[in-house]
Amino acid sequence: MSEEEKELKNRKKVIIGLGIFIFIFLFGFLSEILSFITDYQWFQELGYESVFLTKLKTQLQIGIPLFIVGTILYYLYLIGLKKEYYKQIKSYHMDISEKRVNQILILPAFVFGLMTSTSVAGSLWFDILLYANAKPFNLTDPLFNNDITYYLLELPFLKQLLNTVTSILFLMVIITVIFYVIMFLIRRPTLYEVKADLQWNSNFFVSLLQIALKQFAALGVIFFLVLAARYYLGVYDLLYSTRGVVYGASYTDTHVTLWVYRAQILASLLSATGVVYAYVKRNPKLLLIAPISIIAVGILGNVISLGVQNFIVSPNEIARELPYIEHNLSYTRRAYGIGEIQETDFPYDTELTREDIENNQEIIDNIRINDYRPALEVYNQIQAFRPYYRFVDVDIDRYWVNGEYRQVFIAPRELDQRELSDNAQTWINQTLKYTHGYGVALSPVNEVTSGGQPVLWMRNFPLVSSVDIEVTRPEIYFGELTDQYIIVNTKEKEFDYPLDNDNAETLYEGTAGVPLKGVNRLLYSWRQGTLKMLLSGNITSESRIVFDRNIVTRMNKIAPFITYDEDPYIVINEGKLYWMIDGYTISGNFPYAEPYMAGNNNYIRNSVKVVIDAYNGTVDYYISDEEDPIILTYQAIFPDLFKPLDDMPEGLKAHIRYPQVLFDIQSEVYATYHMNNPRVFYNKEDLWRIAREKYDQNEQTIESQYMMMKLPGEESEEFVISVPYTPIRLDNMRALLVARNDGEQYGELIAYRMPKDQNVYGPKQIEDRIDQNTTISQNLSLWGEGGSSVIRGNLLVVPIENSLLYVEPLYIRATSGTSLPEVKMVIVSFGDQIVMEPTLEEALNRIFGARVEEIREEIQEEVEGDTDGETITEEITEGLGEASQLIRRASEVFDRAQEASRQGNWSAYGDALEELEQVLRQLQETTQVLEN
């Protein structure tokens, strides 16, 4: 056979081998390829193909050059290893040709290049984009004077890059060892080939080290240079130190640890030089000097730090740490967005009257006597109707109802396919038939039926509304339980909702889904792992597959870099249903900011409001915080993903809420960081905690509550979220934190501080007074012994005018069977009074007296037909007005008596008691006249 024929034969072998490799590669990655195609179609259907392609383009821009360069470098490195091996053993005699060996080395170089490029492109693509597009925070840290964005977006990439380089170095060490082991096994040097200075012996590892000394030396130099870079970046970790009295760099960190890091940088650079020296001297033992010197610097630094902390800082801690406490205070408040809280004094008094109650009837009408937990139970028992329908959660929102601004409970009725009967668990039912949930349950928070259940404004099948809110598109194709893919526009009609003896059916009229025509039907059959899709006669060219319908999955697939709230809530707008979800930008790299979140995170912003159409599945991202540099960086990377909040339809914008998750974090931080004075903060002289309450029969921290409230100085009620504070070891109320939700005031935080010279009851004190009230406690015990359990609802703190009203509903549930909880009583507390009545109105009447209009009506009925009735009515009305004035005067005199008692002014105290006696006598005479 001629040389040309041999060459041709070898080429054919190479081509065949390459073809086999490509086939195996494609077959092995077929699933990934199909997922890539179908995911692209999914993004395209939503209008976010640019988001999908940004990731792909960036990975290719990183991966392809890195693959080419990496493969070449790996190949040259392997060739260098081979040559070095034969050079060391002074032999170039080989069993196979030099050319053949070089060809064989192409394959591992290709594999290593592919591994490295795919790993780096897959893990670093987003970090690189963040680094390249980072927007400034316009705030610098106090130690190194870097913009905060450097720590939030740039430093994480640099650290990740060093980790990647370190991993590649370890891979190079492994490659070197494995290569020389293989070479040693297939080409062990003969007696005449061994160099005299190698001292070749039976100790394989010593021999290996002698041969690979050059490569290990080169890798060692790079390693110590990388280590120096790691120590350089590690300096910035001092901003997150936990050594001092607060989070962040302390006195010891800035005066000792910082210099230890710098010494370790120098030691690492000297170690790199030492590796070169060890190689030149051919003495591997000299390599031990490098790690020993670095470790010694670290140990010495720790000893010095310990000494400085114990003998310089601790004896005079407040003076040494004062500047760092100030940094911690300032940067923690900035990181959690509590620096803009408006702090104001609450002009507290106990002079609330019946007239004030009537003037604030909008607030009274929105006091929540229903609790969302019992309401959820009720919805699932009386509005689910079928086992496969489920209300996952009850959300609190506000709507204009019949011209009034009302707070409501709202819950979507979703279809849970897992609850279909065993016989109904078929592919047709799960994919074509039972495709969507239906409608919502809507209730006012303050109204109950005669049986103590929530009044349902929106209910049943088909959806019925007793108010002026309508839902014309009640189907829910996208929700929290929609985990199964479905196919719409098929020959099989979809189940819509149950009727008495039949089922209503429908066909999908929306825009969601990828068409199942052409090759798509085969692609999605493969993706879903079923032949039924391919063989079903119900599927036509007009059919569409709808997958990834779960709203959480949907958001995470589009924008996984955003953290989403775990409590999506449903909104009605123009007859359609929409999901609204809060999105957060979170980081754990804000300098000096105390971590208060899971994962040691210490920065949070509610930067995104996500809206998902429950029928069509469209997903819209609206930027709600245009001052957050992280979301602005995301917007620079994905310009087609985000929209300004002004683009949100007004009907939806009216339902955005200040997120409870963010408010709870901020309220927890504010309990400590309301103290601005660093000395007060150091001594924790004014430390607060979120108030305690008794829920059910257990004591717990009060849950922040959405409610309607008329804030001091405002003319109308608004939707807010609030939480009360008490001193850390006391139970009297110290402050009330409120976040506004409506209109231009959205996002404003106000802290109302209670006067320190008055005892303002905290929720726990009210709970204790309820327990101490003989009448109430006896009734609670009686109900609890009669085969029922008593559930004490959330205690609500309701500001009205300059006073505080406390309201707590009581629920009764039979301990046997599947009985529903019902509102049994409402407890109301004001000042020193506590009453329990079947309704809120009756409880208020007991405290403040009945409405004048109601009394007039009763009197009019009693005197109807009497010729003097009008005169009698006028006299009684005048008497009621006089009694009201006397009650107000008695309250004022009583307050004066208490103030005199606190000041030890017993003369004024006695005068006040005498005046109080006169007022009470006049009141008694007036009431006797009314009774007659």
Curated annotation (Swiss-Prot):
GO cellular component, one term: extracellular region
Protein name per Swiss-Prot or TrEMBL: UPF0182 protein Amet_0022
Sequence intervals crossing the membrane: 14-34, 60-80, 104-124, 166-186, 208-228, 256-276, 286-306
Cell membrane recorded as keyword: yes
Compartment list: Cell membrane
Membrane topology: Multi-pass membrane protein
Family, similarity comment: Belongs to the UPF0182 family.
Keyword list, A-Z: Cell membrane, Membrane, Transmembrane, Transmembrane helix
The keyword Transcription is annotated on this UniProt entry: no
One Pfam family linked to the record: UPF0182
Organism: Alkaliphilus metalliredigens (strain QYMF)
